[in-house]
Amino acid sequence: MKGTQLRHKPHRSIVKFFLACFILTGISALLTFAQGGSLSPYQGEKDGVSVGGKWNEFQSEDKMTGAKKVRFELVADNYFREDPDYKPRVELFCTDGKLKLADFNPGVRLPPPNRPGFWGQPQLEVMVRIDDTHAYHGWNWVRDHFLSMDKGTTRGMIGAQVFKVELPTRSGREIAEFSPAGLDLKAVRQACDLTPKKPSKD
C-alpha cells in the first residue's frame, strides 16, 4: 500500500507543476491585455504592446533579409453594420525605419472602385475628417478589402484628436470613427521616419 502511494506522488507533482505553468501563462496574458496590449494574428510577429492612447505596436523580422518590421494599429471606436464583430482599423507598416504603407481596413468588403488614380490605378473616393478639417481623397483600392492611405492624411492623423473616414460600402455610406490621440510620436518617428503635420484648411 505504501509503495502504491509513493508511486503516485511524483505523478501528482508533475500535474501540479503543469497546472502552475498554465495559471502563470494565463496571468501573463491577462496582464498584457490590462496594459493595453493585443495578440498578434500573424505568425512570426510579436504580440502588440501599447504605444499610447488606443495604439498598439507589433514587431517582427523578415526571415530572409533580416529587415526589422514594425506595424502600428489603431482600431476604430465603432463598427460597420455588415460586421459587428470586426471593427475598422488603420495600420502603418514600416520596414528598417521607413514607412512602407498606411492602409485603412474597413472590416467589410469594399464596393468597386469609383475613380482612377493619377497612373490609372483603381481608387475609392472617401471623405476624411482630421480634427476641424475635412477633405475628399482618392485612396488606392486593394483587393476589395483595403484602401491605401495617402501620406498627408497619415501625417495629419497621427497628431490628431479626431479622425473619421466616410466611405461607400455595400450596405450604404458608413463612417469609421477613430480616437488617435495619445500616440507615442517618438516611437513612430524612430520606426517609420514619420512626423505629424496638420492638414491645411484651404
Predicted feature locations:
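N-terminal secretory signal peptides that target proteins for export/translocation
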Residues: 1-16
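A generic "folded-domain core" signal
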Residues: 33-202
